[in-house]
């Protein structure tokens, strides 16, 4: 099932709904992973504004989780390839989230912006101490993220506080899908209509159950939490006016334009 978080232009009202194959949104009262009911109202997709699928209680990020991306980042830093020995998790900031079709604002002092197309896991149940066999039971669904990064800041700063978390640096959407075949999924990232990255979405060093199981040994996972699963391949430098599309088969396409502040 495809779930969309939307608002109605001019009214300020925001709600969730299901999206069908005819681009009709069937509105609910409540949230998808908890108690809810259909209101009887329907909207055309073209008549609503798509919002960020969820503003999470906690925003997790897997980081280096695909081998080609690891090799690229280590080469840029002048280091030998160091493959992570275990599934360690990081954090991102919710202030950076923007929705499908919203602009990514390049800060005035930023000099090297890149995209990172990622699969995003949405948690649907409170969970602690999960085995890998149990881990997928807490997953509600999936969406798409673009982990926008300023590479100069990433290398120069002690943390990723601005390189990864500046306002608008985390586009996510356009919706959540509960039925998703990771084994068949392909991730393609295009800049101005030209494919720049293409990889098997499931070709991760550490898969989703491994991450969720390891995380839940020390952290309680809550409904609405999100886990970004990393990216692969090379990302070109982006400039003012570039439009980036992250397409994951079975999920859809996340589209954002980059503009200089």
Residue map of PLM features:
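N-terminal non-catalytic cap/leader segment that marks the start of a structured domain
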Residues: 1-83, 180, 194-195, 245-247
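Catalytic-pocket segment enriched in acidic/His residues
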Residues: 48-53, 69, 151-261
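A generic local secondary-structure boundary/capping motif
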Residues: 49-51, 77-79, 104-113, 127-134, ...
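RNA pseudouridine synthases
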Residues: 65, 123-145
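Structural signature of FAD isoalloxazine-binding scaffolds in flavoprotein oxidoreductases
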Residues: 78-99, 115, 245-249
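Ligand-binding beta-strand-loop-alpha-helix segment within the catalytic cores
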Residues: 100-102, 109, 117-119
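Residues embedded in well-ordered beta-strands
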Residues: 118-122, 143, 188
